[in-house]
From Swiss-Prot:
Keyword vocabulary terms for this entry: Ribonucleoprotein, Ribosomal protein
Pfam families for the chain: Ribosomal_S9 (PF00380)
UniProt source species: Rickettsia canadensis (strain McKiel)
Family: Belongs to the universal ribosomal protein uS9 family.
SUPFAM superfamilies linked: Ribosomal protein S5 domain 2-like
NCBIfam families on file: PRK00132.1
GO cellular component: cytosolic small ribosomal subunit
PANTHER family given in the database record: RIBOSOMAL PROTEIN S9, SMALL RIBOSOMAL SUBUNIT PROTEIN US9M
Protein's recorded name: Small ribosomal subunit protein uS9
Signal peptide: none
Example GO biological process: translation
PROSITE patterns: RIBOSOMAL_S9
Gene Ontology molecular-function annotations: RNA binding; structural constituent of ribosome
InterPro entries in the cross-refs: Ribosomal_Su5_D2-typ_SF (IPR020568), Ribosomal_uS9 (IPR000754), Ribosomal_uS9_bac/plastid (IPR023035), Ribosomal_uS9_CS (IPR020574), Ribsml_uS5_D2-typ_fold_subgr (IPR014721)
Length: 161
């Protein structure tokens, strides 16, 4: 695969040459920074990248709707917590990509990311989100296993004689 850079009178475009097939990628449009807010959230081993923009309340996680991605309704309610707290439900669209960890960690990472993005969007939300504990990163992670033991804290059975 060979990458060619082609200069035209239009903005710079990238052409990719793959086995005698030439495809041209158009440049991405510039996004107005005043209407879109970005934040990252973390929980356990999960990292969520969250983009928040003014909209109708649509939430997309890894190119799936929130109901398709999270099967449990309690997870969805937890993720919507920052919007309920700030009374902004159905006012923002959320697009996020999340990697690593399990479902619970990913839920926490998305929640943290949405809270941080809402904080950036309007400074008056900061006090509400801080009081609700949504801006603080939950630093609890799995304790490591120790040698000579079965698990992190479980020991082998002790025999007196």
């Amino acid at each position: 695969m060979t990458k060619l850079k082609i200069k035209t009178d239009k903005p710079l475009t990238t052409a990719v040459l793959t086995s005698k097939k030439l495809t041209v990628k158009a440049p991405r449009e510039k996004i107005d920074s005043a209407s879109k807010f970005y934040a990252t959230g973390k929980r356990k081993n999960a990292i969520a990248r969250v983009w928040l923009k003014v909209g109708k309340g649509k939430i997309v996680v890894n190119k799936k709707t929130i109901d398709q991605y999270f099967s449990s309704e309690t997870y969805v309610k937890t993720i919507l917590q920052p919007f309920v707290l700030t009374k902004t439900i159905d006012q923002y669209d959320v697009i996020c990509t999340v990697r690593g960890g399990g479902i619970s960690g990913q839920k926490g990472a998305i929640l943290h990311g949405i809270s941080k993005a809402l904080d950036k969007s309007a400074p008056d939300f900061h006090a509400m989100l801080r009081k609700g504990g949504l801006l603080t990163r939950d630093s609890r992670v799995v304790e490591r296993k120790k040698y000579g033991q079965r698990k992190a804290r479980k020991k082998t059975q002790f025999s007196k004689r």
